Amino acid sequence: MMKKILAVCFVFISAFAFAQEKPDALKMYVEGNYAQAIKVCESEIAATPNRIDSYVVLCWALVANKQYSVAEQRASDGLAIGPNDLRLVESLGEAKYYLGKNKEALALFERYIAGISDSASRVGVAFYYMGEIYIRQAKYQHADISLTAAVQKEPLLDRWWTRLGYAREMAKNNVLAMAAYDKALELNPSQHDALAGKRRIEKNTR
């Protein structure tokens, strides 16, 4: 009886030790160790091909590591397994955005926002990228709407306020553009683009 108990304890302790030693790809991603996170996720997928969470972290790490073409492919691979995983939809949108595929990226961000909870962590990010796409397309009123939604979700990012100011400036909405630039400079007094934007407006309204 004692031997059986000891054997069970040994198995349990061994399993616990293995779990403790198992690499944590998400932790690596959060800590900025993108290359290692990618390696771990690919190993997990090789061992368990249908593991959607591994695809999700993999794509986050690939985008963060600026491997956009690979991220596009791996997000598509993940969606072939879990076509309704909105985390992969958003990651695919980011990859396509950086690859200049604006129309496809915009559709993916719209799909993500329509399907995800309003409190999801990357809703603000999706709105931000939509705003940037609209700026690329010179649709500045649309960009204003999207970037306004983005800063409502993430109000402490001076870069986002600066881009909102730029969209409003391009739409000739100088009063609100100045307000956005001022907010950016409140958050970061050395925000160069916000300072430049304010100077342009001041020069053009003299």
Predicted regions and their residues:
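Register position in tetratricopeptide repeats
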Residues: V30-E31, A64-N65, Y98-L99, E132, ...
